Amino acid sequence: MSASKTSKSTGFDIRDIYTIPGDKIAAIYERNKMGVHFQGMSKTLQFPQTVALQGAPTCSIGISPYGLYNRLNDAGRLIMLNQKAVQFASAPFICVDGACTMLTQKQPGDAELPDDIPAVKNYYHPSVPEKNVSLTIATPSLEIAFKLPAVKVVRRLISPLLSGGDQTLMPLGVEEFQVENTSNEVLEITLVVPRPSLVNLQEKELKPTDQDSVYIGVAAVHGQKHEEFRSAGVRGVIMGSADTSNRMALAVPEMAGVAVDTQPYFCLNRVTGDLLLNADGSFYEKRQPTLRSDYGAAISLTFTLKPKASKTIPVAVALDFPQQVYIDGATFERKYVKSFPKKETRTADMAKLASESYSKWWSRTVAIQKRIFDSIQATPSYKGDKAGAMRLTRLILNELHFPLSNVIVWVEDDKGNERARFLECFDYAYIDPSDVDWYSMVLLMLFPRVEKDLCQGFVDSIQAVDPTPRYYHFHASAVEARKHFKEHPEEYEGKSLTQIRDAFKTKGSVAHDLGAMPKGHPLRNVSDYAWYNNNYWVDLFPKLMMRVLRNVKFTGDMDFLKKNWETLKFGLDSLLKLDFDGDGIPEGYPEDVKNTFDNLVLFGADAYDATQFLGGCQAMIKMAQMLKDKDGEAKIQKAFDQGWNSLEKLWRDGKNKKGEKLQYYITCYDPKTGNANTDVWTNQLDALWYMIAIGEEPCIPADRARAILKTVYRTNHSFMGWAMCKTENGAPVESDQGKDVYTTSNYVFAQLLEYYGMAKESKEVYKHMDRVVFDYGNSMITPDNLRAELEKESGESVPGPHYIVAAYPRPGAVWTHLVMNHVKDLQAKKKSKTVDSKDLIPFFPNLLKGA
């Protein structure tokens, strides 16, 4: 097989996206690693550091910065692969004229755990010195380059995620090894690719008292059934088990000039022994499994290389895990199964398909990556700034971790209808929270039919009602609180029970989510969030209105709007009932948490919810016009006008103690008491950002928007980025959550700065987020929020960076930068602030098409 074409073309090389040398890998992923801040009732997961995900939505393998397996994502369960034996059994090794080197810079002793087998050097071949390693992250692809005395090896991981068809959902991956003889001698080379079996892992819940979906995984020690296979020019090993239908394949195409041998079983702690080679590159002996041992399989590939010659070898990995299994015992067949009608040959057929298709995956992926980079560099702000354009490109591509990691179910019925669900994160295992998904266009971009189904679920929730009482907040989380409630009813007399025990679902409210993993299977369509009573939140309905309009404009699906219009109008009527003070802005119950920032207590009208409400009304007005509903439009316009007049009461034009000019909407104001909170809230223009991005005219005048952005930029800056809130004098606020830097908020902020002509400031925000993601080891696990300054946590010796929770979908908002540029171009060309649906519909298909 000839070497594949390099990624270099017309000023674009994937190595420019993000490449770091070996010593910097250690600095970033070990010494600079972000810790976890204890905020709330429990400390979240120190998430496995990841540079690539091999597989597909609902089933993927995490790859560590050292090229080793470190986690399995299986139908919403994050299964930690902490065993040293499992990790190092995934490391390829190369033998050049009899001398073998493991293709990782990680030393086996570095991975020791207290309960793991001690690492002795004769278990493994020597590693590559870190100075001879480089790492390129170009999500969803990865390259690791190794320089050895006589050869150079590039290990490239190629994903089907952007393949553009059914293969996107097939849990496949190909590792392409490019081996180059850099010497002046003819070399005899054997490449050995081992893999641990991930079939029938023994899983134990990591934190049984918490709400997460995280498990410790241990390799199976019984029931292994591994078989060699040879089919239609492909050769490999299928790893199975007597205890499950799951199977895993490791395979290579048969190639001229390459001798192939397979080792069906090797004990994970006996790499050098069980994978000992003969002089011809074949395995010295084949063994059978014994009880209480864990196993993997391996392939050896032996070839001769002339001086300066190279050879490219693809190795396919297939995870044939046909069933998605859940905590309540429910099972659903994965969609890919329908593409392989012969059950008995399915695993081998999957590996064969990967071997045949990977070059198309690669060319399509590089074409899309280049298109993203080119579209950024073509804008006035980035013309001539290649480094800045690459920075933004890698931030955008990084958010493709979400569909590879957080998809928890994907099914297709007999009529071809697809349903899928996505996790908020593995620590807060809620399914498609509507307030979180609102920020990201990734689902609409990649899977518009799934996005439509999800949106329909939230529209349907408006009419749903369940008066059954349930516990909320501490009483939902702690059995001690529930016990106290039952045994001491007298202590609750005269208290509001809204956040203690109240109805499960009130009619007219929008569901927060579509379920939670610890409660049952993900297709139940029941909102399980109970940290606060979101029946009375005031941001969920406006966000749904904007989301519906966005989807209709980007897909042209007017039937969706027609079918749901009456329900949407009922939802608005229900929301307006939460306007208790009659100022036109629904404020919810006093002293209650009332929006996505669920540890932030507000009073009266607040800048975030007021602008969200106006954005929702603006979306409803536009939809009424699209449906020619004159009466509905007039009614909604009246609500908008009253809300706008009340928003003006939050406007402040003054100076702080430093004499700096401040122009912004204050955090909140109570028209009844006159109480005001003058903190500066970064998120006060989120709804404006959303409406601009879907081609609607900004409802806030441009001069005012610029003034707000300048105030936020100057006031809310911190070491890590722009904090959610600061006082008018730039000091930290009281709320722990308010102190935090939100990556999504910073992406929204950067895009608004760019849109309103402040490109320099926008780039500065992106630089801060680039440091968060790539300098602190958060590639492929983007944190949602993090501490604003370096802090010293309990047990730490020096101040350092900390996040609250990682691997979140909301930062997918960074993709909207591309949409905002498109909208701005269309506005200039058409000399109109409004962009029609027909001009938006082609955007994502054109962005994601092949070369």
What residue ranges belong to the model's regions?
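Acidic/polar, glycine-enriched structural segments that form the non-catalytic walls/loops
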Residues: 3-37, 148, 153, 159-172, ...
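A generic secondary-structure signal for well-formed alpha-helical elements
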Residues: 181-187, 195-203, 315, 319-325, ...
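Large, well-folded core regions of big proteins
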Residues: 379-398, 410-414, 562-566, 573, ...
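Aromatic-rich carbohydrate-recognition surfaces in CAZymes
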Residues: 94-98, 181, 340-365, 426-585, ...
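The feature captures the catalytic groove of carbohydrate-active enzymes
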Residues: 166-168, 173-176, 233, 263, ...
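Active-site core of glycosidic bond-cleaving carbohydrate-active enzymes
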Residues: 432-463, 541-543, 562, 566, ...
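Beta-strand-rich N-terminal accessory domains
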Residues: 2-114
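Extracellular-facing/secreted segment signature in eukaryotic proteins
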Residues: 103, 108-110, 115-126, 140-146, ...
